Amino acid sequence: MNILSLFVLIPLLMLLGLWIARNVNQVRGVMVAGSTLLLALAAYLTVSYIGQRHAGATAEMLFTDSIVWYAPLHICYSVGVDGISVVMLLLSSIIVFTGTFASWKLKPLTKEYFLWFTLLSTGVFGFFISTDLFTMFMFYEVALIPMYLLIGVWGSGRKEYAAMKLTLMLMGGSAFLLIGILGIYYGAGAETMNILEIVKHQIPTEMQRIFFPMVFLGFGVLGALFPFHTWSPDGHASAPTAVSMLHAGVLMKLGGYGCFRIAMYLMPTGAAIWGDFFLVLTTISVVYGGFSAVVQTDLKYINAYSSVSHCGLVLFALLMMTRVSATGAILQMLSHGLMTALFFALIGMIYGRTHTRDIRQLSGLMKIMPFLAVGYVIAGLANLGLPGLSGFVAEMTVFVGSFQNPDLFHRTCTIIATMSIVITAVYILRVVGKILYGTCQNPEHLKLTDATWDERFAVICLIIAVAGLGLAPYWVSNVISGSVEPIISQLIR
């Protein structure tokens, strides 16, 4: 069996194990065993991929395999990875692993919750290993469908409204995406849906002009592209902790990954035609998301709008179409995925104790729960780009690469986008100063306890990942840059 298929097989076996589990301890055992296997598999795959590249492997995708699924439409189960998908698999496995511990005490319906959570994970892993357009779309839908129940049943606040809004908007984006994929298939005339074969065929310019915006918009909705981002803050705010972690940390990255891997790679002329239009929208996303975070008072909404800004920066960097900016975009996906997972984990732990996310009702938490408070400070410092943490490496690579474009329009957009650095500092320092320091105003909060062992373990794992990427970014950027080059070389400026 191909090693990549294990990323689908293991979650499927986890689903079976969860189905037959008879109590909460067995459910936890299945989740810990399965998520640990996935993390170990992702680490092994990363090391193997680097080893094969160093040994001289030149193929664009490694560990490839293809099985005919439906011959009349040339649909195959085709898998393969390059440096981009390898780091996305590693990110996904880290968040699934830590999300398991962040949900350790979740009630009620623990078994059913983890069933849907694992199905969501299956879709995410399957999407990143797929090289067939239809298979990729299928896994994309598998990843979206569980979100409705995970938010609608186990969420909080206006959970039914948030779940329905998220589902309708993302399914609307999927409709555009499906039309775009069919346009690529018929336009290429390749009699295959394999990305590696389609890219060898030239799709007519007029078809690219029509179908590029459909594919980019279809994925862009999931990437919180302005003005189609409104589902994201409500969805984040209402979702349970681990779902918020996976949603913001990984699911939104499917949007940026799809825009780069499918829309821009397969339709480079369309990217040249529409690039400046979408660049304006992404610039607005970056700045608007930051300003929106400044005026929020709910911790989850603050982080949700921060995610809109940071995910907008991913699409912004991709549309700059330079090798350095594209490398920065992938680093930003990885960095933001880890940072926002850490944020949502900590927010969930604080909310579980205080039963409020309103920063006006929180203060003095540094003395009451120092571990969680220090974790929040580290997450905040990473988010505002402190050197030595992941945010600095990613954002500087994005802005340096973006400024390499010599024309006035692109440099103006870059200068506007850099405002997000200052805006981020404003809302992060505001929240840290408000909730962690000062005198505790609520006597009931003085009785609260700090993080438990399972919570500490999840937080420490994420902090290590954030610090590791910030202190030793070379190995990640080296893996990414080699895979960015073939896609960038396709693009027309």
Each predicted region: which residue ranges?
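Cytoplasmic juxtamembrane regions at transmembrane-helix boundaries
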Residues: 101-116, 241, 249, 444-454
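Hydrophobic transmembrane alpha-helices and their helix-loop junctions in integral membrane proteins
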Residues: 98-104, 122-134, 147-434
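Transmembrane helix-loop-helix hairpins at membrane boundaries of multipass inner-membrane proteins
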Residues: 2-3, 18-101, 105-115, 191-197, ...
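Short phosphate-coordinating micro-motif centered on Lys-Gly-acidic
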Residues: 141
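Alpha-helical transmembrane segments and their helix-start/interface "positive-inside/aromatic belt" motifs
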Residues: 25-36, 161-171, 369-374, 453-461
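Hydrophobic alpha-helical membrane-insertion segments
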Residues: 33-50, 170-181, 372, 376-384, ...
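Central hydrophobic cores of alpha-helical transmembrane segments in multi-pass inner-membrane proteins
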Residues: 5-20, 32-45, 89-103, 120-122, ...
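Cytoplasmic/organellar membrane-interface segments at the starts of transmembrane helices
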Residues: 369-371, 428-493
